[in-house]
């Protein structure tokens, strides 16, 4: 293992739950406002996971006041306190970008049986 791989391996988090695109998650993100730091929750559907290793990210989409909001979080960042999986969705795609065009009941995802 070379130097870069050993540094990256030391920074990987091990407390990440198993989640896939289509799952509804609640992300507890640390937000710094001036000198204060607080936890902000962002709950939505995972529409994509990209890259691997230390560079891995996931995109979470939610509808807030009728407007679609998406946030991209790095998987291994210390800024994310916790990731809760609320429900597991049954989808047949790795990237759910088509959900951006759907509204209301059409944007629902069936629950996966475990």
Swiss-Prot record:
Protein name, entry field: Large ribosomal subunit protein bL19
SUPFAM superfamilies, sorted: Translation proteins SH3-like domain (SSF50104)
Keyword Ribonucleoprotein: yes
Segments crossing the lipid bilayer: none
A Pfam family it matches: Ribosomal_L19
GO CC terms of this entry: cytosolic large ribosomal subunit
Keywords: Ribonucleoprotein, Ribosomal protein
InterPro entries named among the record's database cross-references: Ribosomal_bL19, Ribosomal_bL19_CS, Ribosomal_bL19_sf, Translation_prot_SH3-like_sf
GO biological process annotation, one example: translation
Signal peptide (from-to): none
PROSITE patterns: RIBOSOMAL_L19
Gene name in the database record: rplS
Function: This protein is located at the 30S-50S ribosomal subunit interface and may play a role in the structure and function of the aminoacyl-tRNA binding site.
Molecular-function GO terms, alphabetical: structural constituent of ribosome
Family recorded in the similarity comment: Belongs to the bacterial ribosomal protein bL19 family.
């Amino acid at each position: 293992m070379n130097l870069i791989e050993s540094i990256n391996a030391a920074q990987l988090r091990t407390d990440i739950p198993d989640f896939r695109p289509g799952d509804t998650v609640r992300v507890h993100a640390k937000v710094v406002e001036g000198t204060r730091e607080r936890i902000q929750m962002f709950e939505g559907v995972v529409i994509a996971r990209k890259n691997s290793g230390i560079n891995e990210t996931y995109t979470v989409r939610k509808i807030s006041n009728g407007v679609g909001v998406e946030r991209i979080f790095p998987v291994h960042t210390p800024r994310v306190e916790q990731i809760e999986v609320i429900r597991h969705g049954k989808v047949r795609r790795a990237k759910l970008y088509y959900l951006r065009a759907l509204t209301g009941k059409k944007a629902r995802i069936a629950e996966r049986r475990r």
